[in-house]
Every structure is written in structure tokens, then in C-alpha cells.
């Protein structure tokens, strides 16, 4: 980090940390990505990196962003800039020497706080005041910020869930602007919508923001037929279990989220198996045997939330049982059968064994043949 900052400031340019790394440092939360803003232009950033023996990658050079690699760690370095034209998805930018121009084009006040390499805070838009009370607020006019990129509607709810103070509630101006610009969501790629909803569902307790999204018509816009009603019940049931956003998505419901949110093959499989298990309504031990422990837990939590009932007391014993048993019959045990008849017989015996809650032995099962 020191090497990168020294390289950028080598010829008198300004370089400041900005965004998530500053916000999370001040909140004493983990920092993952490091973003740096500078008054150097793209070609100067590349030149300064080369002069200091650092690798540079032109990841978003047309938008003024260069990735610098130092000690196998990446740093996103972006020029001070201002938006000249936006279409709700992309922006035409112009470089600037003024940090305030750069701050004004960001989304929320808490994301427009800068820091020097020595830790001096530069706060052109008084974002620190909002950060201290955990108030997630758009910069200046919320409508203008949203029209610049409609994904900011979903980001507003995600940031409120992740960083907002629940006692403060949701910023009223921001919420009204999100509801007023709801049609803009249709302009966004499904992948972007899916990625942002996934992040919302991964926050510790998204109940409040999902209920607000539901009331504002935003949830039904991205997931027709969905409802936030059962999410608080699920979150209460989750208790000490690891948060699984797919389970929360199952409880939200809605038409074909695997397509409307562009889920990966792995995510789609997990979603469909959990839903299939709910529709079959089998015991957790059977679901664990057929689909594995993760699906069994997801199924049990979803079912308890949707039916507003408690989890079975012996849930974990059932899941352990289902994942540890092995069907005792193999094809070689039915030597007199072949092809379709063999397949049918194996299925029939397996159903019988499952119905016995895995108690029938090989000998017992073969007696039925």
C-alpha cells in the first residue's frame, strides 16, 4: 500500500484512499478492496507505476480506472472525474482536478470520504457526520443520483441493511426517490440485479429493507410474485446457523428467480433442490440422504418459516442420519434382473428402505423380492 501511494505521489500528484476502504476502516469493519482516487491522468498513472516497478492493468482506462498490482495485491486507482452524461447504466466522464467534483459523482455520503496515506480525513461533502450515526443517504438530490445509475436503488437498500442504524430507519428522501424511479430497474442487466439482491440477502438481517422494498413495489418488480412476509420468521429460525442467502431467496418466493436473477448453475441447482424438497414434504433425514446436508438444512429452515412452525428438536440428528446411511442393495444383489426391470426393482426397494427410515437390512429387503 505504501509503495503504491508513494508511486502515485512521486511527481507531486494527489492520491487519496476513498470509498469502502475508508468507510470500513472508520467503522472498524474488515476492508477487502482498496480504492484510490488521484488527480493524475490515466497515462500518468501507468507511467508512475512503471517508474516504481509496479505492474499496471488498464481495467477501465476509458473510465479513468487503472489497476495497480503490488506484492500480489490489487489497487483500483481512478482519476478525479465528473459525469458529463448518464443513461441510467453508464456515464460519460470528464477528468477533473477538483476532489469535490469527484465526490459529487459518488452514490452515498458515507462513500465520499477520502483519507491521505497518513490517515488525515478529507470530507468534502460531510459524509463523516452521516457515517458516525450510520445514516445511509444519497449525495445531494437522490433522484439525480439514481438516474445516473438505476442500480443505486438496490445499492441503497443493501447499504442501509449493512451499514445503517436500524433505530434510524430508512432515509425517507432516499426511499421516496427509489419508489419514484422504479421503472429504471428494467434498464439494468439481470446479472447486475441478481448480484445486488444476493448481497442484500447476505446481510445479517435484511428483513427491514426487504419489507420496505416490498411495500414500494421494488421487490415485485425484480421478482414477480415474491413476498417479504416470511423472511423475519426465517431469520429468527436461523439462529446460530450460517446465513445462506439461497434459503432466504426460497422464502421470498417469486417466479423463476434462477432466470430473472441469472443465478449460476450451482446456485440454481441449490435453489431447485430446496424447492423440490419442500414440494415433496419429506423428513429432513430423507432430504439429507437424497440431496445432502446443506439442502436438508435449507429445506428445514425454509419449510419452518413458510409454515410458521418450529424446527424439529432432533433436526441435526436427522440430518446426520440421512448423510451417514448407505442403501444396502446393489445391482449385483439382483442378478436375475436386467435393464428396466432391474432399475424398477432397485427404485422400489430404495423407496421401501427410505419408508422404514433406513432400518430395513439387506436381508429384510431381499425377502421382499
Predicted region positions:
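Catalytic cores of the polymerase beta-like nucleotidyltransferase superfamily
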Residues: 1-369
Amino acid at each position: 500500500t505504501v509503495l503504491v501511494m508513494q508511486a502515485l505521489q512521486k511527481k507531486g500528484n494527489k492520491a487519496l484512499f476513498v470509498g469502502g476502504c475508508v468507510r470500513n476502516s472508520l467503522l472498524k469493519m474488515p476492508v477487502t478492496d482498496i480504492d484510490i482516487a488521484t488527480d493524475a491522468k490515466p497515462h500518468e498513472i501507468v507511467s508512475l507505476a512503471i517508474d516504481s516497478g509496479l505492474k499496471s492493468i488498464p481495467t477501465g482506462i476509458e473510465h479513468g480506472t487503472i489497476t495497480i498490482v503490488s506484492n500480489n495485491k490489487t489497487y483500483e486507482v481512478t482519476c478525479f472525474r465528473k459525469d458529463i452524461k448518464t443513461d441510467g447504466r453508464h456515464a460519460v466522464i470528464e477528468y477533473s482536478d477538483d476532489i469535490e467534483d469527484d465526490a459529487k459523482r459518488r452514490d452515498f455520503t458515507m462513500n465520499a470520504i477520502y483519507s491521505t496515506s497518513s490517515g488525515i480525513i478529507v470530507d468534502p461533502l460531510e459524509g463523516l457526520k452521516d457515517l458516525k450515526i450510520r445514516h445511509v443517504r444519497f449525495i445531494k438530490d437522490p433522484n439525480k443520483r439514481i438516474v445516473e445509475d438505476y442500480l443505486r436503488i438496490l445499492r441503497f437498500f443493501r447499504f442501509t441493511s449493512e451499514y445503517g442504524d436500524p433505530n434510524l430507519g430508512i432515509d425517507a428522501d432516499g426511499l421516496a426517490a427509489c419508489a419514484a424511479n422504479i421503472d429504471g430497474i428494467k434498464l439494468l442487466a439481470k446479472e447486475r440485479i441478481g448480484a445486488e439482491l444476493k448481497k442484500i440477502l447476505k446481510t445479517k438481517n435484511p428483513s427491514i429493507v426487504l419489507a420496505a422494498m416490498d411495500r414500494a413495489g421494488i421487490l415485485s418488480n425484480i421478482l414477480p410474485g415474491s413476498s417479504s412476509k416470511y423472511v423475519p420468521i426465517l431469520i429468527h429460525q436461523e439462529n446460530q446457523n450460517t446465513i445462506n442467502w439461497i434459503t432466504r431467496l426460497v422464502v421470498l418466493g417469486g417466479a423463476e428467480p434462477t432466470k430473472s436473477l441469472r443465478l449460476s448453475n450451482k446456485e440454481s441447482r441449490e435453489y431447485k433442490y430446496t424447492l423440490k424438497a419442500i414440494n415433496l414434504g419429506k423428513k429432513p433425514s430423507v432430504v439429507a440422504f437424497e440431496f445432502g446436508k446443506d439442502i436438508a438444512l435449507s429445506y428445514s429452515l425454509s419449510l419452518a418459516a413458510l409454515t410458521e412452525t418450529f424446527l424439529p428438536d432432533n433436526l441435526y440428528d436427522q440430518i446426520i442420519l440421512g448423510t451417514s446411511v448407505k442403501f444396502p442393495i446393489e445391482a449385483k444383489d439382483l442378478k436375475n434382473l436386467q435393464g428396466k426391470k432391474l432399475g424398477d426393482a432397485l427404485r422400489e426397494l430404495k423407496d421401501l428402505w427410505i419408508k422404514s427410515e433406513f432400518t430395513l437390512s439387506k436381508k429384510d429387503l431381499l425377502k421382499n423380492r
